Amino acid sequence: MYRRLRAACVTVLLGAAAAPACAQAVLVASVPAPGASVPAGEFAFHLRFNSLIDHERSRLSLIHPDGSVEYLVIAEAGPPQELISLARLAEGAYVLHWEAMQVGGHVTSGSLSFTVSAH
């Protein structure tokens, strides 16, 4: 009886410890923030996640006000938990879309909308 209980407890504890390692990367901060308004011109995007990100296999794309899509180059030398990229922005409404590949192989994706104003 005690052996089974102990085995069950060990299984539960090991499963709980392994769960975070299998979880997908979660976006914890971004520049711009969702819904933000930023000035026109050169802009540095920063997306920070709760785990290490594979910069080489992750993707960022920017949907411009006219509907065109620009695939952004991710800075290879960025922090291991961040995706960083530069773009020139004109006035209008944009959507930044990401596909972040966690170092463990899991992919998470999402998007955020923001506007650019002539300041």
Question: Which residue ranges define each predicted feature?
Answer:
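Acidic, low-complexity Ser/Thr/Gly/Pro-rich repeat segments typical of extracellular/periplasmic
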Residues: 27, 36-38, 44-119
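Bacterial N-terminal signal peptides that target proteins for export
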Residues: 1-12
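Surface-exposed, proline-enriched loop/turn segments that connect beta strands in immunoglobulin-like
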Residues: 32-33
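Boundary of Sec targeting at the N-terminus
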Residues: 23-24
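N-terminal signal peptide c-region/cleavage motif recognized by signal peptidases
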Residues: 18-20
